[in-house]
Amino acid sequence: MANRFLRPNLIHRFSTVSPVGPPTTIIPEILSFDQPKPEVDLDLSDQARLFASVPISTLLRSTAILHATSIGPMVDLGSWLMSSKLMDTTVTRDLVLRIVKGTFYDHFCAGEDAAAAARRVSSVYESTGLKGMLVYGVEHAEDGGACDENIQKFIETVEAAKTLPSSHLSSVVVKITAICPMNVLKRVSDLLRWQYKNPNFKLPWKLNSFPVFSGLSPLYHTTSEPEPLTVEEERELEKAHERLKSVCLRCQESNVPLLIDAEDTILQPAIDYMAYWSAIMFNSDKDRPIVYNTIQAYLKDAGERLHLALRESEKMNVPIGFKLVRGAYMSSEAKLADSLGYKSPVHDTIQNTHDCYNDCMSFLMEKASNGSGIAVILATHNTDSGKLGARKASELGINKENGKIEFAQLYGMSDALSFGLKRAGFNVSKYMPYGPVDTAIPYLIRRAYENRGMMSTGALDRQLMRKELKRRVMAW
């Protein structure tokens, strides 16, 4: 089978590849994989088998919630209400949060604290065989005080994870935006971009990491030479490294993988820099990386950056884990690029995004199967990608239980795909955020928008759940 990575329509033909330098660097040969045909023994049509472990009460609630989030005007109304001044009134706020907690929150979130979330992880595993990814649901921090509070919550997450059998838990998740002030991440990203454009530009605070840019990376965020970090900014960056180090150490001691979530391209260079620094520091076990970074396949530079990071990790003999996703900031990325007079960094068509995801998936699976220190979590709600991944694993003869390859979906979404992959023998996990109801509102609104419309992510689940409910009622 031809080993070719990243198709010509996704990555141009380049002459060289370099981790540093202006965007004139290009890959000599396109390393793209011939994708397997999606036909595979992954049956997503037999709803009775897929939802056999789900009680009828859960099916009823899930169907109702997914149906509600598919109605555009209802989603818009809910989003408006959550951000309106009505929420400033105690009575209204308490009423709305109680309703949300008993419906959308319980469907998409794991609990209000780490202990409750750990119990939910065990409950889900015992009833379905699906593992859990535990994540404290806070997203951003504006100052060092908030970062200090958040890192304690992430440490609590690891402590809760330690109480679970290893078979129940896939990993814990940390957001760099919650442990480093946003303004510092933006400044670091600007300086990293400027150094990439001007390799002689010195960054005295910079630690050892892998490449975070490629010839296709968007650099328009930084149009002039940034000021050096102030003493206070350097101090905050050092504190952020210490916070990340503290949670990495606990994960390493407990043998619990740590996934680092991605953000938009304004901040992503700094996040990649910190993720790869921590991978170099803590990924010492050749068979099981501790630190995983996230690759967003909807970005045009995703394949090149993945290739460069992997090449550097192999050079340094550092194992690395990746979580592969499509991406969640399409609208904001397009708006920012347009406002600055540039093309969006996101692929021009959804098919190009699908192709990039599937190519990166095939490439990573090849790497993971050949005994290298690569581990991959294939986070997808796309059934074709699920089928392609299952077929690729079969072609490569991958041991489905070896822990080097895993599929994942969000808790409360794409259950049919999760159950289908699990029935096919794969390790499958659910991304399970936890935290107080009010802090989960932004997350819940995003899930609602993803499910709206007849062709949304939740369409297959809604269809199969209704079919299974009808079958069970008719069987009475």
Swiss-Prot record:
Its cofactor is FAD. Gene3D superfamilies: 3.20.20.220. Pathway: Amino-acid degradation; L-proline degradation into L-glutamate; L-glutamate from L-proline: step 1/2. It is found in: Mitochondrion. Keywords: FAD, Flavoprotein, Mitochondrion, Oxidoreductase, Proline metabolism, Stress response, Transit peptide. GO terms for molecular function: proline dehydrogenase activity. The keyword Transit peptide applies. Residues 1-29 form a transit peptide. Its main location: mitochondrion. It catalyses: L-proline + a quinone = (S)-1-pyrroline-5-carboxylate + a quinol + H(+). Signal peptide: none annotated. Disruption phenotype: No visible phenotype when grown under normal conditions. No proline hypersensitivity. One of its GO terms (cellular component) is mitochondrion. The keyword Acetylation does not apply. Expressed in the vascular tissue and in the abscission zone of petals, sepals, stamina, pistils and siliques. Not detected in petioles. Transmembrane segments: none annotated. Induction: Down-regulated by high succrose; via the repression of bZIP11. Up-regulated by proline and salt or drought stress. Belongs to the proline oxidase family. Converts proline to delta-1-pyrroline-5-carboxylate. PANTHER family: PROLINE DEHYDROGENASE 2, MITOCHONDRIAL, PROLINE OXIDASE. This is Proline dehydrogenase 2, mitochondrial. It comes from Arabidopsis thaliana (Mouse-ear cress).
